[in-house]
A protein has these predicted regions:
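Acidic, metal/ion-coordinating pockets
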Residues: 1-141
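A short C-terminal boundary segment appended to hydrolase-like catalytic domains
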Residues: 119-172
Length: 172
């Protein structure tokens, strides 16, 4: 089975008019319900999650106290065979976390992950290879969207406020 979920932080960053008619809720209960319904009917369970990991995969140290990323909890609480994530713009090479094989490619289509699965009576085995993207973007596409890109960058560069003191990463 393939279950697709998205971070519920979409509700925070997206304009309400873009979400008209769509309900985006906590991804954990939705994934749990889908998995429970389907897992006995399939050989492999796969969750595709537009979200990332809230903990360091090597140490378990909390990286973020928000609920924007919950992939670590997905692996702890649910038993998907595979979890494909994408949100944090960092590579997670194939590894097993709490019994779930997890991967995450970096941003902007710079790479992709080739995943192979072997299912037998002895169990399930997953491997992955990170493959750098190659080739070049067509010049006409770059030219066609250059104005839109400049507009987006100008908008992102607008000052929205000032602080009385610098806000550094360790500022309480």
């Amino acid at each position: 089975c393939i279950v697709g979920i998205v971070t519920d932080y979409v509700n925070i960053w997206e304009k309400p008019e873009h979400l008209s008619g769509i309900t985006i809720s906590d991804p954990l209960p939705a994934a749990r319900a889908a998995l429970e319904t389907l897992k006995d009917q399939v050989d492999v369970t796969l969750c595709i999650y537009h979200g990332g990991f809230e903990r360091d995969l090597a140490t378990g140290r909390v990286l973020s106290a928000t609920h924007e990323n919950v992939a670590y909890r997905l692996c702890q609480e649910l038993d998907f065979d595979l979890l494909l994530t994408g949100h944090q713009h960092m590579t997670v090479h194939g590894q097993t976390l709490c019994g779930t094989f997890v991967v995450q490619p970096t941003d902007r289509g710079q790479e992709f992950l080739h995943i192979e699965a072997a299912v037998s009576e002895a169990g399930k085995r997953f491997t992955s290879e990170t493959v750098p993207a190659s080739g070049a973007c067509r010049r006409e596409w770059l030219d066609e969207f250059a104005g839109m890109e400049r507009g987006a960058q100008d908008w992102l560069d607008q000052v929205v406020g000032h602080l009385p003191q610098p806000l550094l990463p360790d500022t309480p």
